[in-house]
């Protein structure tokens, strides 16, 4: 792995919003860090229950949440993730009974479908509408349980504006600050260190193939259910805000 910004960190917690985000945004990075001898952990905030489904994958009586979670478990295994958790469920629960943070959904703000914003029908228990202190505490509980010494999540814009991504930036940053841990955001802005994880393209592609309900892999590209194409991310920018 070239351009390693993580220094002495040996146990890195990736905080993501939905099943598939860990593989789409950071699959190659997770594989590279694991290959370097570090242990990587994935905390996923929602079950991705409002995501689109490829035609023919799930019948009318199918359990979408169960499918999403099975895909998530398989993808994490393929990446060599040392531990995974769902926000609101121990070990990612600071106090009180376990709870579910629901997928907020989103709405595209442009015709090219590159910039997202809040959905008008976000449920009352949506992650993006949750108490920020409660979420930060749950993230901190998970970080402590896994012995994390660094946290990674989205930048303040959530990458492409998804409200769950935007919300997690603030909550994860607060959790890292409270624990005194280095906080890294995924970024292509000036000052970001670009980690070249291209040697781990195959691992990233393998993890992405776990998500057959949502996307398909064609060579070094992934194709979303809506037809949008993007290169598999093997050069990943991170920075300390």
What are these regions (language model features)?
Residues 16-18, 162-165, 211:
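Histidine-centered active-site/metal-ligand motif
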Residues 44, 85-88, 153, 185, ...:
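Structural signal for conserved beta-strand scaffold positions within catalytic alpha/beta enzyme cores
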Residues 2-5, 95-105, 125, 146, ...:
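The feature marks non-catalytic terminal segments
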């Amino acid at each position: 792995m070239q351009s390693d910004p993580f220094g002495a960190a040996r146990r890195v917690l990736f905080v993501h919003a939905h099943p598939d985000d860990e593989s789409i945004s950071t699959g190659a990075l997770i594989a590279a860090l694991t290959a370097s001898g570090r242990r990587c952990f994935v905390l996923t905030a929602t079950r991705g229950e409002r995501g689109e489904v490829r035609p023919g994958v799930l019948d009318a009586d199918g359990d979408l949440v169960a499918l999403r979670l099975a895909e998530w478990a398989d993808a994490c295994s393929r990446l060599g993730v040392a531990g995974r958790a769902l926000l609101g469920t121990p070990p990612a629960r600071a106090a009180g009974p376990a709870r579910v943070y629901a997928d907020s959904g989103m709405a595209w703000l442009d015709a090219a479908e590159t910039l997202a914003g809040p959905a008008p029908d976000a449920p009352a228990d949506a992650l993006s509408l949750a108490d920020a202190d409660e979420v930060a505490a749950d993230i901190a509980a998970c970080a402590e349980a896994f012995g994390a010494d660094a946290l990674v999540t989205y930048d303040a814009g959530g990458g492409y504006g998804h409200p769950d991504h935007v919300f997690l930036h603030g909550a994860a940053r607060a959790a890292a600050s409270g624990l005194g841990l280095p906080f890294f955001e995924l970024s292509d802005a000036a000052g970001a260190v670009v980690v070249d994880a291209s040697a781990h393209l195959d691992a990233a592609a393998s993890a992405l193939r776990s998500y057959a309900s949502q996307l398909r892999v064609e060579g070094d590209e992934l194709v979303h259910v809506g037809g949008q194409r993007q290169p598999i991310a093997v050069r990943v920018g991170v920075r300390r805000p």
